[in-house]
């Protein structure tokens, strides 16, 4: 039976045919083995931290199994959310309800009936008991989406729950670190810590090579290497690009991945991503007040202010998700075409614009928080955003 490309390359679901196990550097210990060990340690909470789009949730699904994993998101919680009501609802337990009791009295000719309604709330002990009896593992994904106050409330609930042997995994990003978990004195000695590294190019190449082999599509090692560089350490992005390649090859009735198809596939892939507003917001910067912004002529003839230069610097080759300030500043200088007697912008000016841009993005919805300026480095928190920046803009 011929297998379809969408069954092989699955960007948003468990990749049965293209799952790649990864190992701690210089060891034969896989992430799967480490997670199994953590889950078998009674009374401990598992904390998984790693960059966005790195397969943290897929790792959990691989080890736990789709039938046993119960996923909730930090975004599910606000200050009015009942934690245990949410946990119960995910497994369809009736957390609150009413019980009607009826009483009958009968005489020779008449039967009387009366009754009363009683409200109940399921105890957390019963919820924990259900999870344990049914071998369920609670995975709180995107823990950083919850407010710091809510994170602390959840941490307090989990402290007692893990003592009762509820299995819980908390998943978060490294630069929005779950301090409520990892820095919580009440959880000291009760944590299994797992830090997920970014993907190496050799592991990303395996996704392409395995998948295309399954589909009987030819691809050279050199092409797979180019794909691995462009997918910016993200296995999810690799799945997206490979699926786009398959769609284009099928349309052209071809069975080989060539250099010519790559750029077309990159641009085709960005149709899936909605970052246009994010890019526009970054390029415009904060609302302008007072004097006009200084404009710089670029080597390709554009006129950009510092916010525009920041955006273009992110898009330059080679694609990087972590950029030191010196490298970032160098990229900006390379973009500017200086006229006579004109000087390059001071480093302090660039840093000030990065700080203001950071404040602007932090005040907006989560999708806008694609980059972070912290500790002298620019971090790209979302590889899909950077990929869009490089290939999705009409004038990019």
Task: Label the model's feature ranges.
Residues 39-61, 76:
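Walker A/P-loop nucleotide-binding motif
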Residues 221-279, 396:
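Amphipathic alpha-helical "lid/sensor" segments that cap RecA-like P-loop NTPase cores
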Residues 1-46:
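A short, basic N-terminal segment
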Residues 196-224, 233-241:
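Conserved small helical "lid"/interfacial subdomain of P-loop NTPases
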Residues 49-50, 70-80, 173:
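A short hydrophobic beta-strand->loop->alpha-helix junction that borders the nucleotide-binding pocket
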Residues 68-69, 78-109:
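Conserved NTP-binding/hydrolysis module of P-loop NTPases
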Residues 94-140, 144-167, 173-186, 197-203, ...:
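Mid-core helix/loop region of P-loop NTP-binding domains shared across ATPases and GTPases
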Residues 260-396:
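C-terminal leucine-rich, beta-strand-based interaction scaffolds used for sensing/assembly
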């Amino acid at each position: 039976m011929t297998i379809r490309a969408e069954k092989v390359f699955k960007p948003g679901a468990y990749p049965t045919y293209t799952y790649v196990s990864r190992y701690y550097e210089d060891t034969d210990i896989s992430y799967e083995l480490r997670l199994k060990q953590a889950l078998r340690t009674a009374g401990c909470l598992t904390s998984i931290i790693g960059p966005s789009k790195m397969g943290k949730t897929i790792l959990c699904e691989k080890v736990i199994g789709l039938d046993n994993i119960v996923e909730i998101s930090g975004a599910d919680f606000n200050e009015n959310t009942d934690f245990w009501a949410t946990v119960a609802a995910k497994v369809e337990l009736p957390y609150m309800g009413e019980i009607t009791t009826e009483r009958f009295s009968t005489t020779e000719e008449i039967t009387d009936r009366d009754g009363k309604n009683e409200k109940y709330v399921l105890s957390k002990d019963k919820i924990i008991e259900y999870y344990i009896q049914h071998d369920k593992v609670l995975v709180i994904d995107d823990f950083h989406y919850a407010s710091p106050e809510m994170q602390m409330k959840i941490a307090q609930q989990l402290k007692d729950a893990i003592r009762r042997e509820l299995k819980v995994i908390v998943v978060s990003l490294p630069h929005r670190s779950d301090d409520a978990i990892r820095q919580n004195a009440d959880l000291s000695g009760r944590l299994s810590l797992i830090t997920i590294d970014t993907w190496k190019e050799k592991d990303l190449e395996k996704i392409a090579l395995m998948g295309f082999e399954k589909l009987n599509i030819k691809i050279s090692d050199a092409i797979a290497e180019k794909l691995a560089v462009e997918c910016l350490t993200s296995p999810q992005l690799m799945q997206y690009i490979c699926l786009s390649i398959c769609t284009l090859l099928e349309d052209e009735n071809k069975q080989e991945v060539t250099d010519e198809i790559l750029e077309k596939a990159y641009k085709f892939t960005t149709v899936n991503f909605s970052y246009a507003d994010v890019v526009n917001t970054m390029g415009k910067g904060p609302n302008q007040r007072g004097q006009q912004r200084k404009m710089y002529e670029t080597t390709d003839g554009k006129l950009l202010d510092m916010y525009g230069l920041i955006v273009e610097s992110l898009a330059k080759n080679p694609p990087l998700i972590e950029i030191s300030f010196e490298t970032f500043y160098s990229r900006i200088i390379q973009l500017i075409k200086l006229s006579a007697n004109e000087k390059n912008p001071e480093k302090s000016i660039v840093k000030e614009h990065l700080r203001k841009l950071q404040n602007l993005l932090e005040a907006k919805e989560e999708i806008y928080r694609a980059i972070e300026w912290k500790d002298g480095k620019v971090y790209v928190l979302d590889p899909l955003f950077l990929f869009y920046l490089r290939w999705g803009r009409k004038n990019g």
